[in-house]
């Protein structure tokens, strides 16, 4: 049997790609890769570009950011330089994405010169430094106020309680500290060194920014950035359009070797065919981003890296490092791709041929023109005839020609002012070349003198030639006049970086610290994400601690109490207590410090907001006067805070003060504090009760308590107030509530009076305990404890010197929430030592029980333990819940026997306005109309929940808010709503019941 052999590898290499299976496999792999790219793009952040963009502009922005963001080009409106504006938004998001987006305070990002309204509307964790350097900046602020008002009016619930975070100080003068910063086209006014100094002032280590970039700025006096349709030009000053005609050698010398110029050169950016605002910036600042490498300032060394240059926009980053920097050669290049096909041609700039200038000329055109000029050159012809030949070739190579009815551009059009001088320069160049070639030929065919000269040694020939040239300058050949100059396509910059910053930077320790901190923050964020996922529909349940229960000291054991007090007295401060080996002491001290910091930040935010309004209205830190469009400014802020107002020195207010409102403090040039009737000052809603700073100071002065915290976690209506009433002992106890309304209810239950001296002594709010003198007690009873910050509860125990706190509350109802979204809140939840449950309600009717069970099933994540899945009712009322649709607020049946609740302040305001129109008594709309949050802990016979809008409102999806709304009544509950709201948990459950 014959045998044969073959090489399988050769066969696969030569024929494998032709097989059907190979083609199918390639097609499948390509399809999978394309599908992955498409799915990744769809998962990216959605960015809506409203500006109308052409086909080329759309390609530019998609090529740059299409792979990172899910771009939606809606083509809604024409805007000045639309592509530049669209790119600016994407650049802002791109630079922000370089930094952690946790929302934690330690991940705050600064924006030097950015648009604060963009960050405000998107909820970014960003502080903007937006100084008013001129009329344009003030115009932008006014426009941003208008835009903010317009958007808030369309969706006020989304922005309820949110404040814009910005200042009007220059970047180097703002005192906000942050590790990260961005600068979107903000470096033009500061330069590289100015940005570094601003970073140093803010404690910033990494900055990422963008700016318009054209490498030809290092060579030319004017140019075009084609992708942006932008034309730039160097001018002598900001108020003169005189062209900068500094010779090339002078430009390179001043650029590379010297930073001193005889005049201030500006760069004007104009957008072609757009009669809109242009921009003028200092060339020194722009050039610094092209030439500078490093800068050492106050113990830090800052280095710039140019990351991406695309579509005329350069993205760069500046990183600051401490300590010593050993010598290192830093090198970078600037390329000029726009001149790689050109050659420099020197032409006369004046008729006396003294001044010459360099123009760029297309290499291909010059080569063909020079070729024809050399072939047609005749020394016997008049120079004019040869000049005409060259001009004819130039015209043919730079004109529009028509071939078969189609017009085509041959070469590149020449400036009409340079046309004749270019022809003359080529003529002189041709003549000089022929003369040089003639000399070479004559030297080859030399005479006896030439042979004698050639017989000399080289040193003698050089000496003799130099003597002849010095004695007879007219005999000197003209080859030193070079008409053609080879243009370099790049310029290099070499700089030696060396800085002695003192102590060496311990990178290893820094890495360990950052890793530890990141793990801690990551765990917190993971917990917060899980919590937010659950809170979309319900408030998560606080699980019982797994730690072993500590023995609870009682008033009957004085020795144990004294021991506890001695243990605390050995610790110097809350900061020291956070390191206590006793876990619960450390936890409580940490929570108290966080609560103090939170109240301090609320105070600082109030001052900052009022100062911003004061400055926007034309005020300053020296005069008691405002100069500006007060009505426009305050009308804009009024949409966010209806309590914003101005008190004039005449004693009058700009807007009527709401009835029953008394402002305790105001703000003017002297800051925030009590004001007199003869002063000009401004106020907002925080000026009615302004005790945040006092609460912070008091909390910091206390020490963490060591007593036992017991929590009774009961369902709504389980008799928490009744339990407080049954165990209350005036000799040893004090009742503390989270708010004034709860305090009044408990006072009525205990003392049948809400304002008697006895009632006000033994039943107080937590704020009242901390801010006023109060007797010490051994036990504190807390109502609605979930509305308190854990640190505030600990501060109350410490102030009262209580050894035991019995806390009543429902962990599944509305809990304490931060009023400052930028504050990094971690320790607000109550950590009890003992926990007990109560699952029987005496208030809620029978039909509410299955409704709440259904809500818990629909809203809470699967696997979540809730006491409402097994709660029972002892009420004798079997049916209480009804609902009806209404078309407007006028159809709401306002009855003094009913209690009205709303989810939003806007609906509450509408009901109050309707009550005033119906001339109902003040006590009705002051006491019988509340929000769900305000009504937590209230018990009424007849309750009506009102929803007047069908716009998106996440509160109707949250289990905690719906639970409070549905469990306030004893006899009847009516749900009156306008329209259909997607995700309305209460409406869906009532419909299914």
Curated annotation (Swiss-Prot):
Q: Where does the record place it?
A: Host endoplasmic reticulum membrane
Q: What is its main location?
A: host cell
**Which PROSITE patterns does the annotation name?**
ALPHAVIRUS_MT (PS51743), PSRV_HELICASE (PS51657)
Q: Does the keyword Membrane apply?
A: yes
> Signal sequence: where?
none
Where in the numbering of this chain does the (+)RNA virus helicase ATP-binding domain appear?
684-838
Residues where ATP binds: 714-721
Report any one BP term from Gene Ontology.
Answer: RNA processing
The answer to whether the entry has keyword Hydrolase is yes
Q: Where is this region: Methyltransferase?
A: 51-409
**Topology with respect to the bilayer:** Peripheral membrane protein
Annotated ranges, domain Alphavirus-like MT: 72-290
Specify where the region named ATP-dependent helicase lies, as residue ranges. Answer: 712-975
Q: Recite the UniProt keywords alphabetically.
A: ATP-binding, Helicase, Host endoplasmic reticulum, Host membrane, Hydrolase, Membrane, Methyltransferase, Nucleotide-binding, Transferase
Q: Which Gene3D superfamilies does the annotation name?
A: P-loop containing nucleotide triphosphate hydrolases (3.40.50.300)
User: Any idea which GO molecular function terms this record carries?
Assistant: ATP binding; helicase activity; hydrolase activity, acting on acid anhydrides; mRNA methyltransferase activity; RNA binding
UniProt-annotated stretches for the region Disordered: 543-576
Q: Looking at the UniProt record for this protein, which Gene Ontology cellular component terms does it annotate, in alphabetical order?
A: host cell endoplasmic reticulum membrane; membrane
Q: Which InterPro entries match?
A: (+)RNA_virus_helicase_core_dom, 1a_necrotic_phenotyp-det_dom, Alphavirus-like_MT_dom, CMV_1a_C, P-loop_NTPase
Q: What family does this chain come from, according to its entry?
A: Belongs to the bromoviridae replication protein 1a family.
Record note on quaternary structure: Interacts with RNA-directed RNA polymerase 2a.
Name the chain's protein: Replication protein 1a
Origin organism of this chain? Cucumber mosaic virus (strain Ixora)
The lineage is:
Viruses, Riboviria, Orthornavirae, Kitrinoviricota, Alsuviricetes
